Amino acid sequence: MISSISLSQDKCKYLLYNNLLVDERENFLVSLTCSYILFQKTIPYIQNVSTLYDKVWDDHVIDQQEDGTCLIYIDRHLVHEVTSPQAFEGLRNANRPVRRPDCTLATVDHNIPTTTRKIFKNITTFIKEADSRTQCETLEQNIEAFGLTYFGMEDSRQGIVHVIGPEQGFTLPATTVVCGDSHTSTHGAFGALAFGIGTSEVEHVLATQTLLQKKSKNMRIRVQGKALPGVTSKDIVLHIIGVIGTAGGTGCVIEFCGDTIAALSMESRMSICNMSIEAGARAGMVAPDEVTFEYLRDKPLAPKGADWDRAVKYWKSLSSDADAKYDINVEINAADIAPTLTWGTSPQDVVPITGSTPDPAKIEDPIRRSAVQRALDYIGIAPNTPMEGVKVDKVFIGSCTNSRIEDLRAAAAVVKGKRAAEWVDAMVVPGSGLVKRQAEREGLDKIFTDAGFDWREAGCSMCLGMNPDQLKPGERCASTSNRNFEGRQGAGGRTHLVSPAMAAAAGIKGCLTDVRNMEVSEIPGTPKQSPRQEVVAEFESEEDDVDSSSVDSAPVATPPSTGDSAGMPKFTTLKGYAAPLDISNVDTDMIIPKQFLKTIKRTGLGSALFYALRFDPATGAENPDFVLNLRALPSRTYLGLHRS
């Protein structure tokens, strides 16, 4: 059970000390309130000049080793069905409970169909694909065994994990937020330090509520000026990635700032932080301000009453100090940003809609020239081709990047009173059940269906195609998702990343088109802020202060016993050969494609490792030029791949 509770003032002052043991600190970082650690700062101390990232990081460091590795406390843990099965298995094997069930929120999103649920009975009968069904069933079994809060498919609050956290107020400023998912960076829009973790780390957080991490560098991207007509946050972040590249933020936490960012809504800020991963960063952050506070004010898990006032006072202190130092500074002029889209197979392959594809013959660097040619060959567009007018087969409006109510309103404003091109299959997938219900109250669903767009249920859908929503080989899609890698939305599928308005325009015209040339309707009755979310029974509000004894005495579910634990086995030490891979910013999709993620077993990477690079996707034949396939390398096992 997740509760919104408060901290007594005398406990909060102890958070100023860094020499407390983990268990002692944990009694103060209670439930969902370490987010707004009610610092009264009554104990004098020296305030260093710090960035937003510095402040949140420093407040969560429990211990630091000589090499800089830190043990940090984790405030929020979001869980879904794909990256959690092996983590729960590890807890069972060690006979451990989840340390903080009240700080953990789970849902299903990646594998589930987004077709109508009018006849939904249970996951077993609803999900037809066996591996997807198994992962979802396994999550439900683990939720029951370990006593966690769960938004299942029959729950109106179910949705994409990075949509439901913010709309419930589970995500709050100054928290550390993790999830076994790359796009956890979304939550940084609230001034939280949010980043994706691997399955082994998921297990570590479930067991200890801590992580071992090294501090990243500070990077500031300041966007100044008023955004031009037709330009959205999606265009801004695509432009930024085009400027700095997909490796530009490597090793950094990016703080997005400037008057352009300050003028954005929370939904828009979430879209930008969501794609900071595509810029190579560990996380993206925006300092909390009045826009943040107004968004959070009525959320079910936000502080209430006097706690709210104290929380806001603390949150306001998080902004980077005027003289704070950054390792990297980037300045962007908003006047330089037009409606932007991708032309190739990397988020850095961007041009304005008025631009054209590049010409490899004009690129001097041989590695870059080869990459551009490969991208053009895959995407099926010739060099120097104008992007406007490229025919599309499908339109996808959804994903954790662009599936919130603001995104749907923007798309509906373009679609209203028009019809989709007859050859286009267009789908709109709300990010959560609450977003879907709000859109239906506003009549957005009817606008879409009247135009021939398919109105779906909440889920990740076509963003990565682990569910039935996939592109067929050769199909071209205007997509509001975050990644356009080869095969991302389906084997052989071709993806162009665009804003919701640009996707809607492509659906109407049947081709990539400049939304600025489209008639855009007013959507009557649309509130400026996101809808107020109702507080439901599963969330308890507790106004009284909670002392430390009541925290550890709360019931915690214990997994089924597996007998006496034999203790943790000794670590295996591996030594081997480091093979060079001349590719920048290697992403998780490249390391292990999505089709190999549908397992609940600890299988290792095996044949999945760099599958798209090691094998021809059409024939399955081994690529003799890939580094791990070279016969000159000694016989070894590579991360689970045996090379004989």
From Swiss-Prot:
It comes from the Eukaryota. InterPro entries: 3-IsopropMal_deHydase_lsu, Acnase/IPM_dHydase_lsu_aba_1/3, Acoase/IPM_deHydtase_lsu_aba, Aconitase/3IPM_dehydase_swvl, Aconitase_4Fe-4S_BS, Aconitase_4Fe-4S_dom, AconitaseA/IPMdHydase_ssu_swvl, IPM_dehydratase_rel_enz. Pathway: Amino-acid biosynthesis; L-leucine biosynthesis; L-leucine from 3-methyl-2-oxobutanoate: step 2/4. Binds 1 [4Fe-4S] cluster per subunit. The lineage of its organism: Eukaryota, Fungi, Fungi incertae sedis, Mucoromycota, Mucoromycotina. Monomer. Its cofactor is [4Fe-4S] cluster. Catalyzes the isomerization between 2-isopropylmalate and 3-isopropylmalate, via the formation of 2-isopropylmaleate. GO terms for molecular function: 3-isopropylmalate dehydratase activity; 4 iron, 4 sulfur cluster binding; metal ion binding. Belongs to the aconitase/IPM isomerase family. Residues 521-568 are annotated as: Disordered. This is 3-isopropylmalate dehydratase. Pfam families: Aconitase, Aconitase_C. Its EC number is 4.2.1.33. Residues 537-547 have a biased composition (Acidic residues). It catalyses: (2R,3S)-3-isopropylmalate = (2S)-2-isopropylmalate. GO terms for biological process: L-leucine biosynthetic process. SUPFAM superfamilies: Aconitase iron-sulfur domain, LeuD/IlvD-like. [4Fe-4S] cluster binds at residues 400, 460, 463.
